[in-house]
Amino acid sequence: MSKVTVVGAGNVGATCANVLAFNEVADEVVMLDVKEGVSEGKAMDMMQTAQLLGFDTTIVGCTNDYAQTANSDVVVITSGIPRKPGMTREELIGVNAGIVKSVAENLLKYSPNAIIVVISNPMDTMTYLALKSLGLPKNRVIGMGGALDSSRFKYFLSQALGCNANEVEGMVIGGHGDTTMIPLARLATYKGQPVSTLLSEEKLNEVVASTMVGGATLTKLLGTSAWYAPGAAGAYVVESIIHNQKKMVPCSVMLEGEYGESDLCIGVPVILGKNGIEKIVELELNADEKAKFAASAAAVHKTNAALKEVGAL
């Protein structure tokens, strides 16, 4: 029997749990939240769609009862607060680091062999924190960001090409941030044909720019962070692990010399399977892409340094 726990029953966490159930990724999905009744209510609401949508997954909600998460195969951490007006980067990291660290430690008490998928922001730094503080093998701690950014990239490519997003292949590497992500336009294809031969350089640059501000654009429209695509991206990563699909998915993972970088979690393509990260795939980047990746890594290192400043590591 397979089991997934999603911590945080807010918009992203609830969407992730809902997609996991609808796609019957696991036999049981547990949602845990600190707010009394929220996860229980959302779980009940979702279960009342089972007959309508035709899924058999059981969804359980609980308030801070980590015992109910016991023996989870994968745990997804969405907990944390958004950055508030006037809040410094260090303050946000300090608050969310405390939350993520506590959540991860409690989860592992009951599911010592679980694979951890991190969605909480700043995602690359929270993934690094979870890995470092728990002392787990690097294959078991994975940040979701690249899967989401790549999905947005494919959406904007499909809009420019006038095709279905499923007909496009595209990948985003680097940090999960609007100035650190690197949409790899050179490698994007439509039905096997390089997109660079189908779109003008100007149009392709527009697609890249739209991808990089994709999250910010949605925040401006919604008045809050997006949740459908982030939640679905988390579920997509979990599905590849639980079903041992061996998909190549860009995720934030610990590098130890790959791409010329070490001691940080950052987005690169990996093969996902039952062991979590089965393999890190090293792409042949050109000089411009290598320079952008190095700059992205430097920015992530700088953010990670704040973990020590606030005493989280």
From Swiss-Prot:
Specify which residues bind NAD(+) according to the UniProt entry for this protein: G8, A9, G10, N11, V12, G13, D33, N96, I119, S120, N121
Which amino acids does the record list as binding substrate? R83, R89, N121, R152
Q: Name one GO biological process term.
A: tricarboxylic acid cycle
The catalytic activity, as recorded, is: (S)-malate + NAD(+) = oxaloacetate + NADH + H(+)
Disulfides per UniProt:
none
What Gene3D superfamilies does this protein's entry cite? Lactate dehydrogenase/glycoside hydrolase, family 4, C-terminal (3.90.110.10), NAD(P)-binding Rossmann-like Domain (3.40.50.720)
A GO MF annotation of the entry reads: L-lactate dehydrogenase activity
Q: Which UniProt keywords apply?
A: NAD, Oxidoreductase, Tricarboxylic acid cycle
What are its E.C. numbers?
A: 1.1.1.37
Spell out the catalytic residues. H176 (proton acceptor)
What InterPro entries would the database entry show? Answer: L-lactate/malate_DH, Lactate/malate_DH_C, Lactate/malate_DH_N, Lactate_DH/Glyco_Ohase_4_C, Malate_DH_type3, NAD(P)-bd_dom_sf
EC class: oxidoreductase
Similarity comment: family membership: Belongs to the LDH/MDH superfamily. MDH type 3 family.
Function of the molecule: Catalyzes the reversible oxidation of malate to oxaloacetate.
**Could you tell me what this protein is called?**
Malate dehydrogenase
**Organism from which the protein derives:** Bacteroides fragilis (strain ATCC 25285 / DSM 2151 / CCUG 4856 / JCM 11019 / LMG 10263 / NCTC 9343 / Onslow / VPI 2553 / EN-2)
Q: What is the lineage of its organism?
A: Bacteria, Pseudomonadati, Bacteroidota, Bacteroidia, Bacteroidales
